[in-house]
C-alpha cells in the first residue's frame, strides 16, 4: 500500500540533499528516491568512474542497511539558473547492526535541477564516505 503522505518537496537546492539524508536516516527509501529525478545517477567515488554503478535505490538501500543516522553539512551552493551544484560533507557514526563501530565521513557533490512545479530534485549525486567501517557501505 503506498504511503498516503507524499514526501516533502525541496524548496531550495540544498534541501534536496538534506531530505535524502533524513529519509535514509529514517529508513524511508520511497522518500529518499522522491528527491531524485527519473534516471538520476548516484556515483560512489570508490567505484571505477567508467564502470556501471549501483542504481540510486541500491546505493541508498546499502546505506539504510547500516541503520544509522546520516548527517550533512552544506559547504557551498553554486546556482546557475535552473541548475545548482551543492557541495557537502556527510557523516555516519554509530554502532552498525553487526555491533561493530561505524565512523564514515566524506565529501559529496550533487547536481540539483529546478522542476516545473518550482521544487528541486537531484540529477547527479556523488558520495565518498571513508573511515572505520567503510567496508560495510562504500558510498
Predicted regions and their residues:
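Short beta-strand edge/turn micro-motifs at domain boundaries
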Residues: 2, 105-137
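Short, low-complexity N-terminal intrinsically disordered segments enriched in polar/charged residues
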Residues: 1-38, 134-139
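A short hydrophobic beta-strand element
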Residues: 81-92, 106
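Short, cysteine-centered beta-strand-loop-beta hairpins and adjacent loop/turn segments enriched
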Residues: 93-103
